[in-house]
Amino acid sequence: MDEEYDVIVLGTGLTECILSGIMSVNGKKVLHMDRNPYYGGESSSITPLEELYKRFQLLEGPPESMGRGRDWNVDLIPKFLMANGQLVKMLLYTEVTRYLDFKVVEGSFVYKGGKIYKVPSTETEALASNLMGMFEKRRFRKFLVFVANFDENDPKTFEGVDPQTTSMRDVYRKFDLGQDVIDFTGHALALYRTDDYLDQPCLETINRIKLYSESLARYGKSPYLYPLYGLGELPQGFARLSAIYGGTYMLNKPVDDIIMENGKVVGVKSEGEVARCKQLICDPSYIPDRVRKAGQVIRIICILSHPIKNTNDANSCQIIIPQNQVNRKSDIYVCMISYAHNVAAQGKYIAIASTTVETAEPEKEVEPALELLEPIDQKFVAISDLYEPIDDGSESQVFCSCSYDATTHFETTCNDIKDIYKRMAGSAFDFENMKRKQNDVFGEADQ
């Protein structure tokens, strides 16, 4: 370990593993350490089930009815991948897809007036949907056609909207869309957590709805994908990539000290040895004095013996409860997967409800979601602090990731990865460049 590295990475969460993989592909000498004996940090999948009970201090352990403990892989942080989103692009460009198998999530649902409705995924479904009345459907269809045709480089597609100055609120007004449709569009399609976006320029929202539609177009049932055996497979896939390119991995390795000289990182001390480096990447747990708390997320893992009602017996789905429907500032999310994804025993389902904490009684806040899941065999409640770095790392060369938020997709995590990459490398992350390097190594020329 007494060596000189370009980059040392602490923690094997998804953000850290992707950056470690990218840095290795870019020819950097990388040392990657984790104090835990398993991959994934905060974003790991826990197996066997006995381990999950231990983690949540449930000393009696799982009952026989839960089946074999090793049939379970339970994610601590529920997220799906947008089929056309940034993480899937990173997986494809780095060819990490060769280590993973994905399944399409069967449906996306939205909560309205105490009931859940399928988010329409085709025009036929949209016309048959009970989410809106007949005239509303026509207006909504016009709006979707406008979004689909919208091209920020072609003013002919703007229809009087200025992408940089017109607010999204004004765009909704232009198409005369009602409050329920606005809730559903902003939260189930554009995937905003709050309504702050309404008064911001409309371009980002239009692009988010496009991402949803393009992701949906790829596989049809929903825009979301989920890896067999759980999300813990993702960091391991990128860890393999890093190893192919000469990255060194050490699990179960305590970090005693991060060594600084004149305010700049020069190395990491572990078990009496020092590995030197020019740059350091880590998650917030390794540098508590360099991060600030930016809120909390509550996540309740629920084990069920039945599919969720009114989802057409789907073995995987997402439910979004827009904040307006339950008088909150932030949306509540439910991610559900099951034995079909090799993450639970036969006939069992895992549903995870999550939201940004707003009150002193977080468990009460997710009640609308839990009511949809009854009866629940077992609940595991986790309330996590969200941390973000207090500086951009330009002086110290210590680059810290942000905690995983309450959203049910990885787009915010990918933005963090691209942001850290840019601060470290001084240039924006370029997918195409990575792809070329990859092809050189595997000897596969672009067709």
UniProtKB/Swiss-Prot annotation:
Signal peptide (from-to): none
Protein origin, superkingdom: Eukaryota
Location of this chain's protein in the cell: Cytoplasm; Golgi apparatus, trans-Golgi network
Pfam families in alphabetical order: GDI
Any Gene Ontology biological process: response to calcium ion
Tissue: High expression in brain, lower in other tissues.
Phosphoserine: residues carrying this PTM: 427
GO molecular function, one term: GDP-dissociation inhibitor activity
Subunit record text: Interacts with RHOH. Interacts with the non-phosphorylated forms of RAB1A, RAB3A, RAB5A, RAB5B, RAB5C, RAB8A, RAB8B, RAB10, RAB12, RAB35, and RAB43.
Family statement drawn from the similarity comment of this UniProt entry: Belongs to the Rab GDI family.
Entry protein name: Rab GDP dissociation inhibitor alpha
Underlying gene: Gdi1
